[in-house]
Curated annotation (Swiss-Prot):
SUPFAM superfamilies assigned: PX domain, TPR-like
Record localization: Early endosome membrane; Cell membrane; Cytoplasm; Nucleus
Subunit-level organization: Interacts with SELPLG. Interaction with SELPLG is controversial.
PROSITE patterns reported for this sequence: PX
Compositional bias annotation for Polar residues: 47-57
Domain PX: 74-191
Pfam family, one: PX
Molecular function, one GO term: phosphatidylinositol-3-phosphate binding
Protein's recorded name: Sorting nexin-20
Free-text comment on this protein's domains from its UniProt entry: The PX domain binds phosphatidylinositol 3-phosphate which is necessary for localization to the endosomes.
Alphabetical list of SMART domains matching this protein: PX (SM00312)
Length: 316
């Protein structure tokens, strides 16, 4: 696989949520923006509008009001709803069903996902590398050599894993880390983008519509992290001849890119939205104008289309 150690890829170890004005998409495969582990203050500062933003004072005020609203209300509750034993040719393991619900209001988009004990164990090892001091008092369920498939052990581990996730989520720098968000969303996102590359748009959409609400809740502190998945949904809807649905999800993506004109998805998204607007009889002139202004600020020898950009995500 080509290198993805650059801003905008999960392999990048520099600051996240920064202006991408100095980056140009390469043919190599960048993975989507994911948060770098670190203090919350740093993440919030990097999520600020860029210095070269063309937003008016009123737009900036509305931007910050929306951001504060997101930060204030998103709180998640974790449950291990069930467990099942899965047997394969050379292995046998327990799959735990995790249910994630937003508290404080009725959540019609509760997330349901499955992870095995080894996935939790991998998460713990990764977190220890970056947050050893922060999680030194967090109890991780021990591994047992025998008895892992007894009803008593599974019930005991379900409770322990629920407590483990809840305690991790209570630590701000951990819940906003790349490792924690990856644990809860990456397998599903990787599958969805694989379906997109294979032209299986209906299946890709089905997966994205289940995982994106969770990703949105986990990345409320930095909405730009949601952009690759939203753009993938746009591409799927568009290629399934659903221009209205594609345009609607594109508007969400543009909202996430407020004050982020230098982001690598900004120009390709505007181009796709202008074409959809023309097709739907909507105002496409203003979108074209924004695209032209963006291209003047950041000239590119060859611009990538939105589809060319999205199919490069989650290649490893």
């Amino acid at each position: 696989m080509a290198s993805h150690k650059h801003p905008g890829s999960p392999g990048w170890t520099g600051p996240i949520c920064q202006d991408m004005a100095g980056t140009t998409p390469k043919a190599s495969a960048p993975r989507p923006d994911l948060p770098r582990p670190g203090p919350e203050d740093h993440l919030e500062a990097q999520g600020s509008p860029s210095s070269n933003s063309s937003m008016t004072t009123r737009e900036l005020q509305e931007y910050w009001r929306a951001q504060k609203c997101c930060w204030k209300h998103v709180k998640l509750l974790f449950e291990i709803a069930s467990a099942r034993i899965e047997e394969r040719k050379v292995s046998k393991f327990v799959m735990y069903q995790i249910v994630v619900i937003q508290t404080g209001s009725f959540d019609s988009n509760k997330a349901v996902l499955e992870r095995r004990y080894s996935d939790f164990e991998t998460l713990q090892k990764k977190l220890l590398k970056t947050f050893r001091e922060e999680i030194e008092d967090v109890v991780f369920p021990k591994k047992h050599l025998i008895g892992n498939f007894t009803e008593e052990m599974i019930s005991e581990r379900k409770l322990a894993l629920k407590e483990y996730l809840s305690v991790l989520y209570a630590i701000r720098c951990v819940r906003r880390s790349r490792e924690f968000i990856d644990f809860l969303t990456r397998p599903e996102l990787k599958e969805a983008f694989g379906c997109l590359r294979a032209g299986q748009y209906t299946k890709a959409l089905d997966i994205l519509m289940r995982v994106v609400p969770l990703q949105e809740k986990l990345t409320a502190h930095c909405p730009v992290l949601l952009v690759p998945a939203l753009c993938a949904m746009l591409v799927c809807h568009r290629d399934l001849d659903r221009p209205a649905e594609a345009f609607a999800v594109g508007e969400r993506a543009l909202q996430c890119l407020q004050a982020r004109e230098g982001h690598r998805y900004y120009a390709p998204l505007l181009d796709a939205m202008a074409r959809l607007a023309y097709l739907l009889g909507k105002d496409f002139v203003s979108l074209q104008k924004r695209l032209e202004e963006s291209q003047l600020r950041k000239p590119a020898l060859r611009g990538f289309t939105l589809k060319e950009l999205t199919v490069q995500e989650y290649l490893s």
